[in-house]
């Protein structure tokens, strides 16, 4: 590559990292937006490893923002298991429910991941347009919900329903955070509990998918050839995810989810008409 090509390659990956970083934490579907950008501008990453790298960047942002919750859950789970501290039971059960909610998406990913990818590849933008409208309708349903359940009130049923919703979100255009938030709030969770459950649930899912892709990363020649653009995308996605999640947490506190429904309707309709 010459200097000019190197520059535009870096810009290219910067844009992809920015799109991933902004759209991953908020309920508008990061995978759907990547497909839209690919169709509009011909922007597409080379190599199977890119998606894993930017997902890890978003994961790092989530880990930093929820670090206190993670430490508390880990410590109290340890105390409940090995010290039989009854006051730590609710945190231990919260971890159990996170594990339960992870199982459905793991099953769907392992059994049907390739089939879903092939189906989406045939007419990706049409699927994204339709699923963005579905996401909008789901968000609209919960715009005024104010549940009462906190972490100690959750049940196995809650975990399974949220887990099934997350499994549905493997389809591009169905937001993972949106699907899990909608399911959580329909099950009666308070907004802050639903938000915490949704993003703590992202951790095992992202880690699991990344671990499964390690062999592909090792074999992928693009990792060595494009390590600088990949690094740019990683840093960009991390910074964008961090601030996007902080912003979204503030939006949730003020109950303004309806604006994401408006956005998904507008983008979904435009995609169906023009792409």
Curated annotation (Swiss-Prot):
PANTHER family assigned: UNDECAPRENYL-DIPHOSPHATASE (PTHR30622:SF2)
Keyword DNA-binding: no
Enzymatic reactions: di-trans,octa-cis-undecaprenyl diphosphate + H2O = di-trans,octa-cis-undecaprenyl phosphate + phosphate + H(+)
Other information: Bacitracin is thought to be involved in the inhibition of peptidoglycan synthesis by sequestering undecaprenyl diphosphate, thereby reducing the pool of lipid carrier available.
Molecular function (Gene Ontology), one example: undecaprenyl-diphosphatase activity
Transmembrane segments: 8-28, 45-65, 92-112, 119-139, 197-217, 225-245, 255-275
Recorded superkingdom: Bacteria
Protein name (Swiss-Prot/TrEMBL): Undecaprenyl-diphosphatase
KW Disulfide bond (keyword) present: no
InterPro entries: UppP
Family (UniProt): Belongs to the UppP family.
GO biological process: cell wall organization; peptidoglycan biosynthetic process; regulation of cell shape; response to antibiotic
Bilayer topology term: Multi-pass membrane protein
GO CC terms in record: plasma membrane
């Amino acid at each position: 590559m010459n200097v000019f090509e190197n520059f535009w390659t870096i810009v290219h990956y910067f844009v992809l990292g920015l799109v991933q970083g902004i759209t991953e934490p908020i309920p508008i579907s990061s995978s759907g937006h990547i497909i839209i950008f690919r169709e509009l501008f011909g922007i597409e990453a080379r190599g199977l490893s890119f998606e894993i790298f930017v997902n890890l960047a978003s994961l790092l942002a989530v880990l930093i923002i929820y670090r206190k919750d993670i430490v508390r859950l880990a410590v109290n789970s340890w105390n409940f298991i090995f010290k039989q501290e009854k006051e730590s039971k609710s945190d231990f059960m919260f971890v159990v429910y996170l594990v339960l909610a992870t199982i459905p998406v793991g099953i769907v990913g392992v059994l049907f991941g390739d089939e879903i990818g092939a189906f989406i590849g045939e007419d990706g933008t049409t699927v994204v347009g339709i699923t963005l409208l579905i996401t909008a309708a789901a968000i609209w349903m919960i715009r005024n919900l104010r549940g009462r359940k906190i972490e100690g009130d959750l049940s196995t049923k809650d975990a399974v329903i949220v887990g099934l919703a997350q499994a549905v979100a493997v389809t591009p255009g169905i937001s993972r955070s949106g699907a899990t938030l909608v399911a959580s709030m329909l099950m009666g969770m308070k907004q802050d509990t639903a938000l915490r459950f949704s993003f703590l649930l992202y951790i095992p899912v992202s880690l699991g998918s990344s671990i499964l892709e390690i062999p592909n990363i090792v074999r992928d020649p693009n990792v060595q050839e494009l390590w600088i653009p990949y690094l740019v995308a990683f840093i960009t996605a991390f910074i964008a995810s961090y601030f996007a999640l902080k912003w979204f947490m503030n939006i949730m506190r003020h109950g303004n989810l309806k604006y994401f429904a408006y956005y998904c309707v507008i983008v979904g309709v435009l995609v169906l008409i023009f792409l």
